[in-house]
Amino acid sequence: MGWSLGGLLSTFVASQIKVNKLILVAASPCLINNTDWEFGIESHVFNQFVNNLKNDSTKSLKRFVSLQSKDKSQIQELHQSIQKFPASQSALDSGLQIILNSDLRDTFKNISTSKKCILGSLDTLVPVKIQDWYEAAGSKTHVLRSGHLPFLDNDFKI
């Protein structure tokens, strides 16, 4: 199972070893839009996020989380976690490079095990319109009324 960037990692692992099921949460096999892919982030938006992270990673991550939920207590708890357990710049840089350079569309299509994708109808990073692509690629999908952090939703179930 993988969420967001973790979905790329889970997809890669499932392509290399036998797994019983692949579950992706708010994930895309290609997170950056290009000429033949419209189910990701616009490159200029991603580049702005990268620059913001380099300037002030804690502030940028807190802002990112704030845009994903309307539950103030959840946001406060996540902000505290970001403050208490800050990511290293090298970890952030590595993750951003994976996002920028990964395109696992063919890899995902070739995985023969059972696949399920949980999407958020309000997700601005992995748009819900990817649902049709996932279903055409042999995956079951489930859509929640949530943003990029659907596991914060009370209806989230695996």
Which ranges hold each PLM region?
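Gly/Ala-rich beta-loop-alpha elbow adjacent to hydrolase catalytic centers
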Residues: 1-10
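Catalytic histidine-centered segment of alpha/beta-hydrolase-like enzymes
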Residues: 125-126, 143-158
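Conserved alpha/beta-hydrolase catalytic His-Asp/Glu region
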Residues: 55-102, 107
